[in-house]
Amino acid sequence: MKDGYDLTERFNRAFQVYYGGRAAEVAAAYREFVHSMPLAGITISGIFLSHSLPGDSDLPSFDAGIVRRTLTDADYQRNGSVYKMVWGRSQSEQTLATLSKFWWADVFICGHQAQESGYGRLGKNMLILDSSHNHGVLLPLVLEKQYTMDDLVQALVPLAGVE
């Protein structure tokens, strides 16, 4: 639900409107495409990049091995680890510390959580980027370079300034 609307229902209805009799075929192609996307990446310097991370309440049943194994249909279900990683919010410093140990990550860069100024810091090692509005930012990285959180914040570029 977002703004009182079931987005899944709207999405499915749009497939029927735009693709008619081919809706199921196109939906299957979308599903295959989305399932082919990587869940995360990690740089040699320990920067973990993902859409989101599991929230505090999801961590006890979360399988951190999903980034290193073949995913199953169960992983994508509402109680599955992919779902928890993609839709997670409200990570505490303890959750970030636990995930950092799982994945040998020093810093997390994620999105998924609205940030009025285009970015926000969560704890000492998570940077949240939001490019969905006119204060959005991007973050150029040198993948083998070691960064502090302050370095990352200093490197942010406002999207409004990109030509």
Model-derived regions: residue spans:
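Feature recognizes metal-dependent phosphohydrolase scaffolds
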Residues: 1-163
